């Protein structure tokens, strides 16, 4: 699953996706029925193309007042399901809920806030994307999460440049208004 996302070689991608499938099945066989089991089952359904069924299961789980850690996993998995359906606004909403839970839980090695930043940047919200990526980068450094730091630093220069251009444009407009106001 997740490791395969970082591979280029198609054969290796298939090998690691196969291993993820085996591990997912093993988890389902060894965990007791409950929320954690159902989250893994929903992930399996998504991989098998049964996104609607996964959404129904995850939304039902979300309504049962799970603890904060479980709620974070449910919302993150819901965000992934909405991504598969192309429902970006719902994906953003669920990533925001996940990021809030991560922050409340004290998690510093997370993916939700940076994924949220990418989506907000794509929607033109450069300010929030910049703030969220900066926070993600600071947390990745603080907890020595090399992979998360690497992920953030791949995209940060793009957002940083857009943010600085926006700030410069704002300064230019303010100076122009001050100049014309002085006459």
State the predicted function of each range.
Residues 1-172:
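A "functional boundary" signal
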